[in-house]
Amino acid sequence: DEEKFENASTTSKLRVLAAGSSINLLTGLLALLLLSTLFSRASSGAVIIETVEGGPLDAAGIQRWDVIYAVNSTPVRSVWELAEYLDDASPGDPVLLSTSRGDILVILGEASGEGAERAWSMLGAAPPFMNYYESRLGLGSSFNIHLYLTLYWSFTVFLSIAVMNMLPLYPFDGERFLYTLLRRFAGSERWLQIAINVFSLCLIAANMIMSFMRNLILI
């Protein structure tokens, strides 16, 4: 409890405060290790996550989580390669898609927008989009996609929690960790805790201001 924590040694306090973030960090790194071990680094197709009801893909029987590997026998290894290939196509053109369901003939629909947006509109695909990464497990594209997403988001979420929890701001553990560490040298003055929070807020504010100024320059 809190009383035992306050009476513990500085080393014990630091271990307790670092435990949560350390576990989250290790879990995130484990997910990243599995991600890099189980999946190829280069994408090999485009995953259809959403289709427009009544659109060309929907009419052809292509469903959510299907993978497009090639168009007219030309490999497309990413959503952008798929969009680039269809850049020269026109509404009404027939295209043969090599998919995880087999070869499927699709008649392109009406085009709207420019670039990639034009390609998606002709296919009848809706965002979001993602590249397909082949798994070394060989258990099918649908399983590969869900396993990839699970590991990817596990890495992202656990790493974010670990970093956020170690921010030197109240009420995160990082604030108490830094306070406990500095208190060993500066005593138990309350001003130390306030100074840590003020300094951290200044860093965050400076980062936000610099980001805003950079965006103004880019505009």
Show where each model-derived region lies.
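Hydrophobic transmembrane alpha-helices and their immediate loop junctions
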Residues: 1-219
